[in-house]
Amino acid sequence: MKIALIGFGKMGREIDSAAREQGEMITRVFEWDRTVTPEALADVDICIEFSTPDAVVQNIRAAVEARRDIVVGTTGWYQYLPEIKAVVKESGLLYSSNFSLGMNIFFRIVKQAAVLMNRSADYDPYIHEIHHRQKADSPSGTAVSLARILTENIDRKKETLAKPPDGKINPDTLHVTSTRAGFFPGTHTVGFDSESDSIDLRHTAKSRRGFALGALAAARWLRGRKGVYTMDDVDL
């Protein structure tokens, strides 16, 4: 594949390294100060986008106009999904809050657990995530995805609270908490607590390597497909 990397921070550099090791060609690199245009994508097969919430929608539009497939790892733009889905017709777009293959297996495990816990009102679910102190957003996009899985499958949880509570939390509220410290690539815990016992499900990333390999696997899967997809559609 001839790949354009849109965003060349820590994740972009990790993808660049993994792609070259796998024999893929990095033909374009767009750093933060370089505008992505359809013309600049003429000689690429696919884009892998890890930029910023402010830039991602315009970057997607450039890829769509150029009829180039795009894998998007940036979060914080999903409110624009309806209008993006309306214009992605002649190319493919795959987005995810986390491209780690292990995390996407974890998503499916959590969904199965949530379905079971929907029948067990004694258990109260919660989410806690830990990332390095330089991470800008809180909670993480992955934690938001996990919260969505729980609230969609546990009827007694109607809303999510992702900040310190002001007083008691309503029983129908799912609490999501965050820690920013040290150099953690990412640890996510989904817990279910009752008066009798506790169950913790945890995924711990050891490096960004898993995210990079997952993004490249997603790019290969996307080639030749049209429309909008998520990692739920990818055969793991």
Model-derived segments and spans:
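Rossmann-like NAD(P)H-binding beta-loop-alpha module
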Residues: 105-117, 122, 138
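C-terminal substrate-binding/catalytic lobe of Rossmann-fold NAD(P)-dependent oxidoreductases
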Residues: 2, 10-39, 121-236
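Rossmann-fold NAD(P) dinucleotide-binding segment
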Residues: 46, 53-73, 82-84
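Rossmann-fold NAD(P)-binding glycine/threonine-rich loop
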Residues: 61, 74-95, 104-106, 112
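Short glycine-/small-residue-rich Rossmann-like dinucleotide-binding loops
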Residues: 51-52, 75, 180
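Short, acidic/turn-prone active-site loops that include or flank metal/cofactor-
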Residues: 32-35, 75-78, 98-99
